[in-house]
Amino acid sequence: MNYITTPLEDHVANMYYKIGISEPDSSIEEIARRLGIVLLYRKKPSFSMEGVITLNPFTSKEVRKITFAHELYHTLYHVGTQIDMPHLFRQLQEWQATNFAYHFCVPTFMLQKLKLPAYRSEAITFIAETFCVTNQFAKERLTIYEKQIIGTLFHERLSSSKELPG
């Protein structure tokens, strides 16, 4: 099977390659530094604005990484404040940032290098520990990855069909 990457997966891989990171062991501080993002820790809800990401230091390192990736998307790709935006547009931006976080925290190009355990529960724990994310986040990311594999297999099967049923 030739895994078909999505544009987001390609974009995340290119981001990491441009900053010289190819393994999952880099800290968010190092990633922020290489991206030119200022990272601050304050005892308040996390947010981002104009190249600065503020994280709550009292959350777990796994939650901070997930939040960092979510806020990174807002910093890089969204402008202005969400306060005056229509509700549906704000929801769209939040969905985009969350989807990006799944791929940024557990990049496909790094995930593909791993030999995942045969049992799904063990694979989830392995992903969570390898990429420093929560088990729930790893479970959802694995589901996203599996759906892309299924889509690739479906595409290959359709492409190999001699004729379409009529």
Predicted feature descriptions by range:
Residues 1-166:
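Active-site hotspot residues in diverse enzymes, especially metal/ion-binding acidic/histidine motifs
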